[in-house]
Amino acid sequence: MYTHRLTLILATLTGFCDDALAQQAATLAAPPPLAIAGPEPEASSPLPVEQVVASIGRGVDFLTQSQRKDGAWGSAESQRYYGITAPIPGAHNAFRTAVTSLALVALIDASSQLEGDRLAAAQSAIEKGQDWLLEFGDELRRAAPDAYGQRRDSHTHQRTFTLYNVWGHAYAIHALVSLYDRAEGDPELQAKLKSALEYQVDRLRRCAFLNGGWGYYDMVARTKTPSGSPISFTTATVLIALQEAAELEVSFPQELTQKALDSILRQRYPDFAYAYGEYLRFHPRIGINRPAGSLGRSQVCNLALRMYGDTQVTDEVLRTWLDRLVARNGWLSMSRKRHIPGESPHFADFSVAGYFFYYGHFYAAKCIEELPAAEQPFYQDHLANILVPLQEKDGSWWDFLLYDYHQAAGTGMAVSTLVRTLHE
């Protein structure tokens, strides 16, 4: 009993110290030297604007032609093998909501580059997708308790509880904010969209982790308040979405926001690589936590912290990590489209999973927007040169096989990214 109490006291004190150090780090004047040291890629030859716009158009065509009759994108239908836990129906509600939202955001982002029949098809798809999100978006929630124990994790030997709904809530917020802006002049529709937005934000409040932030598995006590390890990039994704919701005066509890920020800061290393999750933060030099393993995470984590006032995420830090993404892109691309049945998604070098590829570039494009206008074309050209050649013959992009969700997800992210590579 004494030992148990002592352990709890030490854990509590350690948590307080960690939070204090994390908050202090966020207010320091300058980033550590390692955070602004790295490769310096040369400029790339810009692709013709017409080529990039044509690529965007083909991506839009794929999205409008692959939309389901009910207005959503993606499904659980597949004849292929996948090694990812996805208990029904919760996991698939989450996947479908997330990819539908990403497709909607992409179509809205791309609309300014479209005309004629292609523009008409995109607008029709947006209307159908909006109807679906308004009708079914409130069915997304944390998986039912019977999802507990769907499988036993081979590494921890603990029951796994999936929280994929977090991704659906976050990307639904992005879509609803974009749809709200699009509905300017229609207060009745805007009221419906804002109500749907409030639902998604409230659901994120309910599934915030005990230690702060969010993750997509709970492999510890499986309590009402998730007690597992917060995941750095999941938390950053949610925080960025919540910042967008706040612009429409949909608020989120400040104490939960601060706990989430503290969680990310606890996972940040001096080079501004980020641990995959808090459960790995005391292993700074394992592959997944080194800069090459963090290529797909550092962009989103840097962006989230900067949006919430972290003065250490300077322009120089953003440039350094964009330079890393460009110069070391092969590390991120190594597992793209290489899912091997029976293998962990993290089988590649530095444990980089395929699903980080378009995700990493999606947030890199948003980091570019944070830089001075004169510096943006250098990185815009690099991203366009990376993404355009990877487009599939059917107009899609994808990086990780996931039932029938991967093409809509990858295409949505790629289209939104390419729109941001066009010089103003």
Question: What is each PLM-predicted segment?
Answer:
Residues 21-424:
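Preference for long, amphipathic alpha-helical scaffolds in soluble/luminal domains
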Residues 1-3:
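N-terminal secretory signal peptides that target proteins for export/translocation
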Residues 5-19:
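Bacterial N-terminal signal peptides
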